[in-house]
């Protein structure tokens, strides 16, 4: 399920770049509006197909906790778009892939949840990798995009930590709220919400991709341990960067390759270790 979701999500970054580059009148806010709006509509449609007459109740039941999670989700949706626009796709995806580490940090701050020594070591190594990636952007606008990517990872940390706190909430409708929040903010900031007809297909594809992939990612931890989900998620960084290289000829910098390798390998090994520890505890 998670692998399928990640594979579907992989072209997302390239679609953002293709839409944003289509016309000088289309700015990042325009892209964000359509991304958020179609995400909200797509997820709401999935909720309706499952719950039918209970759809409105499902949205009402998310409560204040769901709205708070939706807020952080909406902010991360926005910062992700700006990250992709202002820095290389490889840089953005590598930095955003540190989400699991950000979750551990936010959980420590908000929930006073203690992390193991292995996790703290992983954090240090990951931040070294991020430093290497971002050091290659110093002096250019790419550094702005790198910071947006870092904010996205932090917002993801808040989103998933609060998801664990409010674990009884149905998170699929919350995804729709996040998209709606992003769209509402963007509509007031965009120069125009009109888009060239040649990118309509890209926009629709973006909405479908987000709706399906994030809905699957949201429910995946119900069927497999979170650590195992974490082992799969870095796959998006690799696939997304390769797709960008192939379609828009954007080659990763040496800093991105070195720093990205450090980050991805560390995240994979940490998730692998966590999975093994969880399996050992189950056998006791």
Please place each PLM-identified region on the residue numbering.
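C-terminal-most transmembrane helix of multi-pass membrane proteins
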Residues: 36, 135, 234, 238-284
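Hydrophobic/small/kink-forming positions within alpha-helical transmembrane segments
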Residues: 10, 14, 44, 70, ...
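Transmembrane alpha-helices of multi-pass small-molecule transport proteins
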Residues: 23-75, 102, 155-159, 175-191, ...
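Loop-to-transmembrane-helix transition segments
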Residues: 1-5, 54-79, 144-152, 187, ...
């Amino acid at each position: 399920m998670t692998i399928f979701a990640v594979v579907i999500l992989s072209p997302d970054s390239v679609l953002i770049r293709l839409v944003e580059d289509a016309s000088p009148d289309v700015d990042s806010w325009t892209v964000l509006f359509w991304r958020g709006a179609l995400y909200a509509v797509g997820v709401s449609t999935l909720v309706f197909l499952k719950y039918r007459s209970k759809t409105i109740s499902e949205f009402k039941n998310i409560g204040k906790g769901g709205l708070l999670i939706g807020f952080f989700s909406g902010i991360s949706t926005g910062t992700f778009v700006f990250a992709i626009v202002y820095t290389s796709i490889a840089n953005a995806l590598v930095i955003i892939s540190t989400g699991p580490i950000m979750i551990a940090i936010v959980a420590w701050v908000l929930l006073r949840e203690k992390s193991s020594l292995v996790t703290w070591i992983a954090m240090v190594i990951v931040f070294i990798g991020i430093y290497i990636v971002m050091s290659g952007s110093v002096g250019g606008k790419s550094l702005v995009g790198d910071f947006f990517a870092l904010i996205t990872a932090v917002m993801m940390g808040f989103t998933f930590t609060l998801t664990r706190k409010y674990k009884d909430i149905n998170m699929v409708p919350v995804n729709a709220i996040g998209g709606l929040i992003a769209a509402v903010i963007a509509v007031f900031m965009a120069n125009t919400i009109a888009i060239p007809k040649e990118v309509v297909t890209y926009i629709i594809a973006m909405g479908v991709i987000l709706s399906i992939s994030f809905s699957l990612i949201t429910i995946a931890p119900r069927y497999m341990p979170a650590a195992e989900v974490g082992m799969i998620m870095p796959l998006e960084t690799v696939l997304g960067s390769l797709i960008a290289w192939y379609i828009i000829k954007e080659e990763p910098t040496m800093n991105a390759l070195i720093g990205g390798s450090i980050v991805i390998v560390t995240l994979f090994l940490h998730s692998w270790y966590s999975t093994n520890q969880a399996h050992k505890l189950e056998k006791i």
